Regions:
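Hydrophobic alpha-helical transmembrane segments
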Residues: 1-11, 40-45, 118-135, 209-220, ...
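Hydrophobic transmembrane alpha-helices of multi-pass small-molecule transporters
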Residues: 1-59, 67, 176-286, 397-400, ...
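Juxtamembrane/transmembrane-helix boundary motifs in multi-pass membrane proteins
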Residues: 2, 20, 51, 55, ...
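Alpha-helical transmembrane segments of multi-pass membrane proteins, especially transporters
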Residues: 3, 25, 29-36, 56, ...
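Transmembrane alpha-helix interface/packing and boundary motifs in multi-pass membrane proteins
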Residues: 14-23, 101-110, 141-148, 229-233, ...
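Membrane-embedded alpha-helical segments and adjacent helix-loop junctions characteristic
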Residues: 41-129, 260-339
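Small-residue-rich midsections of specific transmembrane alpha-helices
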Residues: 60, 356-369
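Membrane-core helix-loop-helix motifs of multi-pass transport proteins
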Residues: 125-207, 344-355, 368-418
């Protein structure tokens, strides 16, 4: 059997085992790569190890370490609380402010940081406004999904790394615009579906704030320096973030043990580990095979919609960053060349990532699960909250939004900005 087909089948098996056994897909992928490499005899030890991207590790480690420090320090949350309070008297602006604040946090610190921020910040907002809890959570997390793929965020750098391997330079600005358009539509649909316009908008949102401490000011200065170095000077994001992190630790902003504890090692291992197996899938011709299969069943009109739906389905059973992104992103260049027509690289990539993000509202995913658990865990909201109904609602919402995103892809919306 063709080694490329074998590599693809092993990738599918790794994803399935990780899902059903609740194991880290990255560790499974590395073990599978070792077995495939040695048993097939087609790969040396050096070639197997070459699949582990040290540059991606440094990028993820540096950025997640810095934003772990920022998050633990609490400076960013205090800034966002002040922003929300500025518009506290404009009740109709609350959903918009939640969307934008989550977008900003996610654009800086990545999707999961945006998710954690919005789930924590939304509960007191729900108490003050009377808006439907699920509605505000969906709107806030749509904002977090919209802003996650920037040059500064860990998520954006993962995509940037995968695009660079295909010779595609940049594209994150267009991707972020497409993500924002799609997630704004999803947020708007949530506002209509949950009848946010019928909520009695009286009172004022006033979140509790504290004066920024000297350590929080230092952390904010470090964050600003990092953004300037990356966006204005074009320096490497991982190296800059790592350097700023070390300076903050040395300055006593946070102790070293707490800083390293804040790093999501499980996610880093998952993303970089899958890369080892994906390197074999690529070098063995597996991506070419996968591309030809997709191209055989699609054309320039349907490719984006089909890719969006495929990514959404994959995301119901696996991690976006750990599986969907490293599996589908490498197919972008070859799919565009194979299918042609009006298909664009960033347009196709946008369809894939938007489909995956649209599926994240499922209660089986980290986003949907955290939304439900955050509401159910609140002593005020839990009394009138039906867990089973919320579970069904979130799952159906996830399915519906994948369908909506796929229709937008079919309409060519994601090819406007490419």
């Amino acid at each position: 059997m063709n080694i490329g087909i074998v590599a693809l089948l092993i990738l599918v098996a790794v994803i399935a085992i990780g899902f059903f056994r609740k194991l880290n897909v990255g560790v499974l992928a590395m073990a599978a790569a070792v077995i495939l490499g040695y048993v097939s005899g087609d790969y040396t030890t050096k070639e197997i190890v070459a699949g582990y991207s040290s540059s991606l590790f440094i990028t993820l480690f540096g950025l997640t370490l810095l934003f772990g420090i920022i998050t633990t320090n609490g400076c960013l949350e205090q800034v966002m609380r002040r922003l929300i309070n500025v518009f506290g008297k404009m009740m109709w602006m609350v959903p918009v402010i939640l969307f934008l604040s989550a977008w900003c946090v996610s654009a800086l610190a990545g999707g999961f940081a945006g998710l954690a921020f919005i789930c924590g910040i939304t509960i007191p907002v729900i108490h003050a406004t009377g808006y439907d809890p699920l509605m505000l959570m969906i709107i806030g997390n749509a904002g977090a999904q919209a802003g996650r793929y920037t040059r500064v965020s860990p998520d954006g750098n993962i995509v940037l790394n995968l695009l660079a391997k295909q010779g595609i330079d940049g594209g994150l600005m267009s991707l972020t615009i497409n993500m924002t358009i799609a997630m704004f539509i999803i947020a708007s649909l949530a506002f209509v579906f949950f009848r946010g316009y019928r909520t009695k908008k009286t009172g004022t949102v006033r979140l509790e704030i504290e004066p920024l401490s000297p350590k929080q000011w230092v952390a904010l200065v470090g964050l600003v320096i990092m953004i300037i170095c990356i966006m204005a000077l074009g320096l490497d994001s991982g190296l800059v973030a790592l350097t700023v992190s070390v300076c903050l630790i040395a300055a006593g902003v946070i102790d070293e043990k707490t800083a390293f504890h804040s790093v999501p090692w499980n996610t880093i291992i998952m993303v970089t580990g899958v890369g080892v197996l994906m390197n074999m899938v690529i070098t063995s011709g597996g991506i070419e095979i996968l591309t030809k299969v997709i191209a055989a069943f699609t054309n320039s009109v349907t490719a984006s919609g089909a890719s969006c739906m495929t990514a959404g389905i994959m995301s119901w059973f696996s991690s976006t960053l750990g599986v969907v992104v490293p599996t589908l992103t490498p197919t972008v260049e070859e799919l565009v060349e194979e299918i042609g027509g009006g298909l664009t690289q960033i347009g196709l990539l946008s369809a894939m990532l938007i489909g995956s993000s649209s599926a994240c509202f499922s209660p089986a995913s980290s986003v949907g699960g955290l939304i439900i658990s955050s509401i159910a865990g609140d002593p005020i909201l839990r009394d009138g909250f039906d867990n089973e109904k919320a579970f069904a609602t979130m799952f159906l919402w996830s399915v519906a939004m994948v369908a909506v995103s796929s229709l937008l892809a079919l309409a060519g919306i994601y090819n406007i900005f490419h």
